[in-house]
Amino acid sequence: MIAYLDTSAFVKLIVDEDGANDARSWFEEAGPAISSVITYPEACAALSRRAREPGRRGARVEAWIEALDARWSRVLAVQVTAQPAGMLALRHGLRGMDAVQLGSAIRTRERLREQGAQAQLLFASFDRRLLEAAEREGFATLGGPLE
């Protein structure tokens, strides 16, 4: 299995919350795990925000970032060009960074096909709108509409 993880799936690798066990399983089973270069800074922002949430006393963002770094070192990070992502935002009504995530996955799928890869690229997310857009773009998806 080759899995593309967006930021919502990647954060669940670090934080114990609904969907975390699924995300961790996908990450461990993926060979390789792939994500956009924007996932790292987005994940840092999300982890910082979660550490400030009520009920998260004792959450140490530094420990989460260390865990993020350990996992990020195992990710193939991909770039995307701006215009295709912009067209995806228009086509699917996506937020800008979600369009970049989907564009990165599409570019990855194209490269895998060019290289003759037989494995299917699965798109993992916990964002309902992004999952629906990925399905319309022909991806099999992993995740759930939790956000």
Annotated model-derived regions:
Residues M1, A30-A33, A70-S73, Q118-L122:
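Short active-site oxyanion
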Residues M1-T39, R50-A63, F139, P145-E147:
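Short, well-structured N-terminal submotif of metal-dependent ribonuclease cores
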Residues I2, Y40, I106-E147:
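Acidic, PIN/NYN-like endoribonuclease modules and their adjacent C-terminal/linker elements
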Residues S8, C44, S48, G86-A89:
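Amphipathic alpha-helical segments within well-ordered protein domains
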Residues F10, T39, T81, Q101, ...:
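Alpha-helix capping/helix-boundary segments
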Residues K12, A45-A51, I106-E110:
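Short glycine/serine- and small hydrophobic-enriched flexible loop segments
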Residues I34-S35, G96-A99, S125:
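Short beta-strand scaffold positions
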Residues A70-H92, A99-T108:
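Acidic catalytic patch
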